[in-house]
Amino acid sequence: MERVLRDIISEGCTRIYCVHLSSKLSAFYNVMKSVTERLKEKFPSVTFRVIDTRQVSIGAGYVLLKLMESVKDGREDLERVVQEANERIKIRFSVLEFDYLMKSGRVKAITGMLGNLIKIHPILSIEDGELRVVAKKRGLKNVVEKIVQDLKIDGRKMLGLVYAGEEMKEIVLEIEEKLKDEHIERVDIVRLPPTLAVHSGPKMFGAGVFIL
């Protein structure tokens, strides 16, 4: 990453914004803090801002959109912008098997084995940059219904849908259909990148809204 930043500086850029996934879920934010601290000494005329979105995937994308808008408007209080954006984001996602979460250490082995055995699936959220289990439901139908229920929020909003394996795409399209009458002004459907899917496994799907 240092080489990438040096290349950007060599092109004449004097303000660099590095926007990252939650520092509580990824080490990359702290790595970039170290890199930019070193570069500040060599390039004192360049301003670096390393920003923790306190989100992942779709949520991080929504924070990034708000940051871009705020920078164009001349705002400097970007940490406050992140806070404001997070207050307007609601994320819900689930996994249909625990194997990958167990391997990554995010779920205890005994919990994961029991979940796989009796088909109990967690519904998770991102709160203050951390994963939180907000509910547990048995069976896919109940998981989908709970996610839809939680995302029915008053007001205009953007809807983001995310899935890992191709077989999960049908599920997020079902969620989209169930939310179509909820004042949705924009829909984004994205596939989870391998860097995140390696933790969740292919049977992950979710949705999130950003209140406008």
Swiss-Prot record:
Keywords assigned by UniProt? Lipid-binding
Gene3D superfamilies listed in its UniProt record: 3.30.1180.10, Dihydroxyacetone kinase, domain 1
Q: Would I find RNA-binding among this entry's keywords?
A: no
Pfam families attached to this UniProt entry: DegV
Gene Ontology MF, one:
lipid binding
Sorted alphabetically, which InterPro entries does this protein's record hold? Answer: DegV (IPR003797), DegV_C (IPR043168), DegV_domain_contain (IPR050270)
User: Which intervals of the chain form a coiled coil?
Assistant: none
Binding sites annotated in the UniProt record for hexadecanoate: S26
Where does the DegV domain start and stop, copy by copy?
Answer: 1-211
PANTHER family in UniProt: DEGV DOMAIN-CONTAINING PROTEIN DR_1986-RELATED, FATTY ACID-BINDING PROTEIN TM_1468
Task: Cite the NCBIfam families for this sequence.
Answer: DegV
What the protein does comes down to: May bind long-chain fatty acids, such as palmitate, and may play a role in lipid transport or fatty acid metabolism.
**What is the protein's name according to its record?**
DegV domain-containing protein TM_1608
Q: What does the record give as the organism's lineage? A: Bacteria, Thermotogati, Thermotogota, Thermotogae, Thermotogales
